[in-house]
Structure formats: structure tokens, C-alpha cells
Regions:
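Extended ligand-binding clefts on enzyme/binding-domain cores
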Residues: 123-124, 136-237, 244-255, 267-314, ...
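Start-of-helix signal in alpha-solenoid helical-repeat scaffolds, especially tetratricopeptide repeats
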Residues: 21-28, 68-72, 120-123, 127-130, ...
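CBM-like carbohydrate-recognition segments
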Residues: 2-43, 50-77, 81-91, 246, ...
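Hydrophobic alpha-helical segments typical of transmembrane helices
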Residues: 132, 196, 221, 329-332, ...
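Extended ligand-binding groove/face enriched in aromatic
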Residues: 43-50, 55-175, 180-183, 290, ...
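A short, mixed-charge helix-start or loop-turn motif at secondary-structure junctions
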Residues: 14-18, 57-61, 112-118, 176-182, ...
Length: 356
């Protein structure tokens, strides 16, 4: 079976079980666009155009943390950058300006609405902010947007970096004390950071003075993160705890970053190549069922716990759980598979779930 066909089947299954919307749905649109572009599939490319044409005016929008979601987020911006959508009257700049006007902390890092006083930031935001602003900047030829994309990624990663393990905490400012971070090293949270870093490394102009800093953070995170890969090829809900349950959506996001690092030559060596192949095969084997339903993806997770346990590793492990067909899984899995295809693994032996 073609690797990209598995990605399309995942999307179709997702589309059958629920309406694809909210930020995790927009991630699936982004991955559908990438898979269609790689496959050069006219029908899938048209599907992308039709889905994204509904944004912003013909969608029953849920609550969003970031205004770019109202315009289709990264999927819209990337599709325009790649020429999948050609619309001279596009509104990328309009929504980029709205993004830049959102609440910020004292260092200029975007906060959740109303959260600037406590400095409330989430690493999840990196995947929402940086790719959209980068592609909007490239399409609009606006250096301000490109710089903002890099600055937000760097700012979030530096603010939430745990130097003791070179991994990333999910959030800051949600435990009742300004500046106090969560204690976790959550798989999907580190994956969100990794996606933003990886997209910047691939598309940020190399002459940017910010490119080397992005590369340094990416390489440090890469070196740390592969140490914790389980024998199954997956990473765990709490990356640093060997007894924690495996978590598939974070694994898939991490694999996307590893794939870009390998393909661009930023990551070199057998250890990264082995980790990537082992991870994709683990995802195929343990997390994708025969009907393309999914397993082992953590439900929504926003600094879990109460009182003194809020934001602790214990809370991330005991108050959250993995769910069958969890909606964060689909776009993340598609990401990993698209990157496997780009790295030369264009076929999968479906019976054994091994890459060819």
C-alpha cells in the first residue's frame, strides 16, 4: 500500500466519524494539502480547495485561541504558498495583522486572550502561530510576518525550556503564580514545538538572522528527545517516565520533525535514521487499525490537575488518558506518513506494517 494512501484513508475515516473542524481539524486540512501535493492527485487537490474555500465566511466556527484559525490556519497559508490555491484577493495579511495584535507577555510572546497579566502561554501555540505567519509572510512578501513567525517559535521554546533534560514544559502561568511553569514533558506538547521548529527550518529563508537560533533549538530538542523513544518506537505521555503509557499523537508530531531534519540534512547519522523508521513502523503497527481508526492518542490536555497537583507530571499521567479515534490523532498521523513518503518510504507492507 502506498504510504500516502494510508494518509488519505486516515483523513477519510476522520471525515466519516465527525465534522472536521476546530484547531485539530485544521491540522488535518494542512496534512491533506501536503499529502495531495506530494501525490499530485487532482481530486485530492480539488478537495483541499473546496474545504478551504469555506473559510472564513461559510463555517460554523467554534471558539479559537488564535484568529488565523478563522481563515483556515496553516492549511490555507501553505496551500497559497504552494500554489494549490490561487486567489489574488486572499486575506492572509488581514488575519496575520490580527494575530500580531493579540495579547502578549512582557517579552512579546503571544498569550491566550486575557492571559498577559499572568504571562499565560502554551507550547501548543507554536504550531498555530509560526507556520501561518511564515507562509503568510512568504506569500505577501512581508518580512515583518516572517520575523514574527520565528520570534514566536523561539520565544515560546525559550520560555518553556527545561534545561535539566532539554525538553519543553507545556505551559506557564496557569498554576496560580505568575511565571510558574507546568512540570511535564508532555509528548504532544514537545511535538507541537517540534512541528513549528521543523517548518521554520524547511521554509524560513536561510539568510534570516533567526535561522541559526531555530536550528540550535531544534537540534538540542532532537538530541534529547530520541533518548526517550520506547522499544515500540513510540514516545510516552510523559516523555521522561519509562512506566508512562505510550502516546501516539505526540509520537507522530515528533516523527514529522525527525523526517524534516533528516531530509534537509540538519540531522545526520544512523541514530536519527533508525529512530525515524522505528517510530513510523511503531505508529503503523500499534496505532492504526485495519479500518484506519486510531489508538493511543491523548485527549485534550491543558495543564491538568487541581490545587497543588495542577500541572504536575502525576496529573498528566493520571488525569488524562488515551482514546480510540481521538481527534488530535488524524492530522498528526498524516504528518508522519507524508514525511515518511518524502524520505523515500513510499510503500508500506500493510500485513506486517513495515516500510519499504
Amino acid at each position: 500500500m502506498k504510504t500516502l494512501d494510508i494518509a488519505f484513508q486516515l483523513y477519510d475515516h476522520y471525515d466519516q466519524i465527525e465534522e472536521i473542524k476546530a484547531y485539530y481539524g485544521l491540522m488535518a486540512f494542512y496534512r491533506l494539502a501536503q499529502a495531495a501535493y506530494e501525490a499530485k492527485d487532482p481530486e485530492r487537490l480539488q478537495q483541499c480547495r473546496e474545504v478551504l474555500a469555506k473559510y472564513p465566511d461559510h463555517v460554523d466556527h467554534p471558539h479559537y485561541s488564535y484568529t488565523c484559525y478563522r481563515y483556515g490556519g496553516n492549511a490555507q497559508a501553505w496551500a497559497m504558498y504552494k500554489g494549490i490555491i490561487q486567489n489574488p484577493e486572499h486575506r492572509l495579511a488581514e488575519f496575520a495583522e490580527l494575530m500580531m495584535a493579540q495579547d502578549k507577555d512582557e517579552q512579546g510572546v503571544l498569550c491566550l486572550a486575557g492571559g498577559s497579566e499572568m504571562g499565560q502561554i502554551w507550547i501548543d501555540s507554536v504550531t498555530a502561530i509560526s507556520p501561518y505567519m511564515l507562509f503568510a509572510g512568504l506569500v505577501c512578501q512581508n518580512q515583518k510576518y516572517i520575523d514574527f513567525a520565528a520570534d514566536q517559535c523561539i520565544g515560546h521554546c525559550e520560555a518553556l525550556w527545561d534545561e535539566s533534560v532539554n525538553l519543553i514544559n507545556q505551559c506557564r502561568g496557569f498554576r496560580g503564580v505568575k511565571g510558574l511553569k507546568s512540570e511535564d514533558h508532555w509528548s504532544r506538547g514537545n511535538g507541537w514545538a517540534y512541528v513549528g521548529l521543523a517548518d521554520l527550518l524547511e521554509y524560513l529563508p536561510k539568510e534570516s538572522p533567526k535561522w541559526e537560533r531555530v536550528k540550535k533549538i531544534f537540534c538540542d530538542l532532537s538530541e534529547a528527545i530520541i533518548k526517550y523513544q520506547a522499544d515500540s518506537g513510540l514516545w510516552r505521555q510523559e516523555i521522561t517516565v519509562d512506566s508512562a503509557w505510550v502516546e501516539s499523537s505526540g509520537t507522530a508530531l515528533i516523527l514529522y520533525g525527525l523526517g524534516i531534519g533528516l531530509r534537509t540534512g540538519i540531522l545526520q547519522g544512523e541514530k536519527y535514521e533508525k529512530a525515524f523508521k522505528k517510530g513510523v513502523e511503531g505508529l503503523l503497527r500499534d496505532c492504526i487499525n485495519e479500518d484506519f481508526s486510531t489508538e493511543h492518542s491523548c485527549i485534550g490536555c491543558m495543564c491538568p490537575g487541581k490545587d497543588e497537583k495542577k500541572g504536575t507530571i502525576e496529573a498528566y499521567l493520571t488525569e488524562k488518558y488515551a482514546k480510540h479515534d481521538e481527534h488530535h490523532s488524524f492530522g498528526a498521523f498524516m504528518l508522519a506518513l507524508v514525511e515518511a513518503h518524502r524520505n523515500g518510504y513510499t510503500e508500506v507492507c500493510w500485513e506486517t506494517r513495515t516500510l519499504k
